[in-house]
């Protein structure tokens, strides 16, 4: 076993978006879909819990900063323009806590970061950054910009057209393989060209695949069962290639993780219709669309995927909940969602007040309550939905309680690890 001492250490990080612990470890008589990685870590991967909401923008931000949303300020893929009902899309500029690759620069360490979500637009870092999802323009997703031409020549894509997963699945699968192949080629070049201390390679196709084809994973009769397993096989080979290179270096440690787990969808659950049916939400007019049409009678609304906001006076233009009534409305919302059943089954595992999960300087932007669903119930704001539940083209959903964490020194992993612990683990592996 390689000792951790004062000598300069290097670290390889493999990120697999949405890969559940059981996909790596195997479960219920089913073998691992990532046998090479499982073997590398001698089967010692830990099950990890992640942020709430259990979505990439929040969870990867928590990973890279080692903080929760009350400190880093990213609460979802969408947020509201303060003092309005207009939706905005937070990005890397909204991150209020320092990511590890900035902090490591203060220790003279350089990082190569490839395809890490929530890092767009790319900004100067001590090393190389190729932003991950959501990145709108490749030109703004690369630092230093001298690498832009290399990425363009390689045909590099930050993300595929996930919409093909609905009804053009053959193209969708081909795009997943192509994007991973090109990303690996670019990573190979940067591995050799750059003098780095931390090298991070993230695969996001695993998340895209499971959203649309999770039902193909265990069903051997499914049309795309073999295709599902083939993509995971390619991911496994890609990761193990890097990991074997690291193992040949006595100064290098390895860490792998996912930002959330995954599971099957029994039903989608639409929060704003539930609020409307129970008298908490109403619109200005019958034909009003979206949140900008909320009425002054509404006392609450929801944003994706599981965030509830009390419609407070002074905070929102038509808010009508006075400070004196705030806690009562929160209690009423907690009672409502704690009791929600879909098809006779309990849909919500737990309702949290924001302060139970978050603290810090960004709390003014936090939702008032957050929901954690039971496995199988995929929560959505559902602003345009009429019913409280339904199904769609998605067959797989994120889970908060079955991500994974593994490293070359498993004894350093805390009992019951969370994604907020990973940055500290990285620093221990780097002997900082």
What kind of region is each of these model predictions?
Residues 2-7, 21-23, 43, 55, ...:
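Secreted, luminal/periplasmic, and some membrane-associated catalytic domains
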Residues 4-5, 174-199, 209-255, 326-341:
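A long, amphipathic alpha-helix that forms part
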Residues 7-24, 40, 63, 104, ...:
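Beta-strand elements within well-structured catalytic alpha/beta cores of enzymes
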Residues 8, 21-194, 422:
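Active-site-proximal alpha/beta segments of enzymes that process anionic O-linked groups
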Residues 27-31, 128-130, 215-219, 268-277, ...:
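Short secondary-structure boundary/capping segments
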Residues 44, 116-118, 321-343, 400-432:
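C-terminal accessory region downstream of the catalytic core in glycan-modifying enzymes
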Residues 120, 205-209, 264:
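Feature marks short, surface-exposed loop/turn motifs that line or immediately flank catalytic pockets
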Residues 370-424:
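Low-complexity, glycine/alanine/valine/leucine- and proline-rich hydrophobic stretches
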């Amino acid at each position: 076993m390689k000792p951790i001492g004062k000598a300069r250490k290097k670290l390889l990080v493999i990120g697999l978006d949405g890969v559940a612990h059981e996909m790596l470890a195997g479960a219920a008589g089913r073998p691992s879909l990532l046998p090479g990685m499982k073997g590398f870590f001698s089967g010692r991967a830990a099950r990890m819990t992640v942020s709430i909401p259990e979505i990439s923008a929040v969870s990867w931000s928590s990973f890279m900063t080692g903080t929760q949303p009350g400190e880093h300020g990213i609460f979802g893929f969408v947020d509201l323009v303060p003092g309005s009902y207009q939706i905005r899309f937070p990005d890397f500029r909204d991150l209020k806590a320092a990511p590890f690759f900035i902090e490591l620069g203060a220790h003279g360490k350089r990082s190569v970061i490839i395809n890490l979500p929530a890092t767009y637009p790319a900004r100067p870092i001590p090393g190389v950054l190729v932003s991950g999802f959501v990145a709108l323009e490749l030109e703004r997703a690369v630092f230093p910009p001298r690498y832009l031409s290399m990425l363009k020549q390689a045909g590099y894509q930050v993300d595929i057209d996930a919409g093909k997963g609905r009804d053009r699945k053959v193209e969708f699968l081909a795009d997943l393989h192509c994007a991973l192949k090109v990303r690996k080629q670019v990573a190979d070049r940067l591995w050799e060209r750059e003098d780095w201390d931390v090298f991070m390679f993230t695969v996001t196709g695993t998340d895209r695949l499971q959203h649309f084809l999770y039902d193909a994973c265990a069903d051997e009769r499914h049309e795309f069962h073999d295709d599902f397993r083939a993509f995971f096989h390619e991911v496994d080979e890609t990761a193990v290639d890097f990991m074997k290179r690291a193992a040949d270096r006595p100064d290098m440690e390895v860490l792998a993780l996912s930002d959330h787990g995954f599971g099957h969808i029994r039903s989608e659950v639409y929060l704003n219709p539930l609020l409307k049916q129970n008298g908490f939400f109403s619109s200005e007019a019958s034909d009003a669309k979206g949140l900008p049409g909320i009425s002054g009678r509404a006392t609450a609304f929801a944003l994706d995927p599981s965030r509830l906001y009390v419609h407070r006076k002074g905070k929102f233009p038509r808010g009508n909940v006075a400070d004196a009534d705030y806690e009562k409305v929160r209690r009423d919302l907690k009672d409502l969602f704690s009791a929600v059943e879909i098809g006779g089954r309990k849909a919500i595992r737990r309702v949290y007040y924001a302060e139970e999960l978050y603290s810090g300087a960004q709390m003014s932007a936090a939702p008032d309550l957050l929901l954690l669903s039971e496995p199988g119930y995929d929560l959505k704001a559902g602003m345009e939905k009429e019913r409280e539940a339904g199904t769609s083209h998605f067959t797989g959903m994120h889970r908060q309680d079955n991500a994974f964490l593994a490293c070359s020194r498993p004894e350093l992993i805390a009992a019951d690890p969370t994604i907020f612990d990973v940055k500290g683990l990285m620093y221990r592996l780097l002997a900082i």
